[in-house]
Amino acid sequence: MDQTYSPGHMSYELVKADEDFLSTTPSDYSILRRRPETSPYYRTPGPAISRFLRRRYSVEPTSSDYLGNGTIPTTVMYKICSYLNKKDLLHLMSTCKRFRDIGKDSSFWQFLNLYGKHISCSSLHAIIDRKVQVLRLNSATINVEVFPPWHNFPILNPAMLTHLDMSSSKFENPSVLLEILQRCHNLYALSLELCGIIDDQMCKEIAKNTNLYFLNLAMAKSFSAEGIVTILSSCRKLGELNIGWTELSGDVINLTCQLLPPSLKRLSFSGTRDKAEMNDDNIKRICDTCKQLEELDLSDDVVITENCLDHVKNLKNLRILTISRCYGIEPMAFLSLQNLDIFNVYGCVTVEGIDVLRSRLRPTRINVSPLSSIAIPTDGESVTSIWKKRTRDWY
């Protein structure tokens, strides 16, 4: 038989519950609020694969520096750091003061590859302060901070850089490039290919590197007569020079041909196009001054004629000659070049003419290298090395 609840009966039950609640002691509160004991293992959400992790209990913080008490010898830490790449080394340096001081040692920063990176000017100067010797900044973008940092003050510390590749780098302000060059007075190799405008002040800073051997200025702009004279008058130990497609004026071309250092072994003077100053007389000056030349690139110098080949043949050490697209030279004159290892004449003769040259100039190799490698930082299979100096970590 169903039981029927009346309104009076319901009010009686509510009153009874209130009396029970009021009779509850504080100890009962703590018992009721206590959560049931759970297993120290719990299941983590995820796919069908069951994974169980141990619950991590909170630990009281401690101010003890277990690694800073000398438990690990410093010599051991130096050995460990020598196996780390730059990214892991920076992570290690952020853990404690001791590791930060160890990670700043110059032996871990002898080379660095920042290819294609976006980096601030202050960060770059901080990296240079770690006594980097080989630095690759190819295709990097160097920005200026909105709020100028410490480097706005005069930078007095000279850099230890010996090899610097800034090809195709983008600078938010030309003064950034000038600040970098002002710190570099011990360079052995420098590349400013496609870096935009190179003014007279930058040329003066480049000229301070008297031990410069590799200099790549291909496709740079705004060279003045004063700037090029400053560089060539001071850097007399140059072995490889690339000034191809630099849009030099006629006066600058004449001065360059007169002031080239006799120590040159590889020279690229291509891309003058129809400049009348790049003629047979200036080729004669180059051959008379730079008698140790082993490779010469005169591509796209359309004013020179076959008469310049008489002077080129006097270079006893010449092994590679490139005169691609030099349309002013009579192709029959090519047959007089008998002592070359490589002869590049792209665009000068037909395919049948190439076959004739290969048969008549044997064992000279014809049209082997369409692109010049003179003073170029990365050449061949070493895509991350610059001038045969490694810039990449082992992993």
Role assignments for model-derived ranges:
Residues M1-I155, L161-T162, L178, C203:
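N-terminal adaptor-interaction module of cullin-RING ubiquitin ligase components
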Residues S64-G68, T74-M77, S94-R100, K104-F108, H118-A126, I128-V134, I155-H163, Q182-A189, ...:
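Leucine-rich repeat
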Residues L114-G116, L137-T141, M166-K170, L192-G196, ...:
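Concave beta-strand-loop units of leucine-rich repeat
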Residues M1-R54, S63, V76, D251-Y395:
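C-terminal capping region of solenoid repeat domains
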Residues N85-D88, Y188-S191, G347:
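Flexible interhelical turns and helix-capping residues at alpha-helix boundaries
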Residues C184, Y188-R285:
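Solenoidal tandem-repeat scaffolds enriched in leucines and small polar residues
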Residues I155-N186, L260, T272-R273, D379-V383:
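Long hydrophobic alpha-helices with heptad-repeat/coiled-coil character
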